Each structure stands twice: as structure tokens, then as C-alpha cells.
Amino acid sequence: VTTEHPEVNVRVNNAGIQQRFNVLEADAVQNWSYFSNEITANMEAPIHLSMLFAPDFAKKENAVMMNVTSGLAFTPMAIAPIYSATKAALHSFSMSLRHQLSETSVQVIEVAPPAVNTDLGGAGLHTFGVPVDEFSDGIFKGLAEGKQEIGYGTSQKALRMSRDEIDEAVKNIYNRVR
């Protein structure tokens, strides 16, 4: 990319696999690759790409690295433990990357969606949440305001929750979806 398209100055990581399971019923011996794919897509790949692009982007006059995490990075959903954990790890990495690149022109932006009505996890599995258009408008508003961490609705609230509020939210989410 840096050789054939040197004008590229924005990288958006919007990868996501969300698998729901109970750890007591999961067969990690026979099916580890099933779980490993989620870790690779949600955490390993975006971190790797960020590290590959950072040196080139740091030389540019303006550049943006945007990582899409999730409101579940802050209030994990117990039946999607790997998804929640990988998005929390990507949040942590984004914060670290933002600090390391703070003396360059690179903006590191994190977008943390709430539940959005998409087909995340497969057709028909994720048909609840805010409409995509409404969510997108909220994200563009956050970008226009120059925010570095952008949530919407419940995820905006989760970005600033106290530890006690997080514990209560996690319990409520689990009781709703288990």
C-alpha cells in the first residue's frame, strides 16, 4: 500500500467477529481454531496493521488511524467473552498508540459502537440495536467535533462509566441475554 498508493493517509480497522458461547460447553481442544479466528480478526490483525502503517503515517502531514472497538470493550457481554476481551484489548492498544504518536501528525481515533442493527455474527443473529444510519450520523458528528473516542447512545455512556456502573451494566446485560 505504501509503495503503490503513497497518497493513502487514513486506515480504518472495522474488523469484527462475534461468537457467542458458554465456556463450559465450548470444546477448546477440538475447536480452538474457531475461537482463535476471532482473536486474530478482532485484535491481532488491527494491531499488526497499525504497527505496519505507523512509521509511514508518522511521516505524513496529516494521517488518521481509526480503530472500531465496541461498547462491549467497556461493559463486556458474558456470552461473547472473546469478542468483549479483544475489543477491550484494542481499546487499550488505541490509547497507547495515541500517546506514542502524539508528537506526530497522526490522529488515533477509536469508534466504539453500541449494539447496531447489522448482521454481526451471521444473518438474522444481530437484528436489534440502533439503526445504522442513526449510528453513522452520530459518528460523523463526533468526528466533526474532533473527538478521539467516539461512542453513541449506550456506548457513549460506557466510555465514561465508573467501575461500579460497569459492574452493574455487565450484570444487567448478562441477565438479559443468557
What are the residue ranges of the model-derived segments?
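Active-site helix of classical SDR
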Residues: S50, T86
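C-terminal helical subdomain
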Residues: E110, T118, G122-D164
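Residue(s) in the substrate-gating loop at a strand-loop-helix junction
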Residues: S70
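Conserved hydrophobic beta-strands of the Rossmann-like cofactor-binding core
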Residues: R11-V12, G16
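Active-site loop-to-helix junction immediately N-terminal to the catalytic Tyr of the SDR YXXXK motif
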Residues: P76-S84, S96
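Conserved amphipathic alpha-helix within the SDR
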Residues: V1-E7
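Conserved mid-core segment of classical short-chain dehydrogenase/reductases
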Residues: Q18-S36, I79-I82
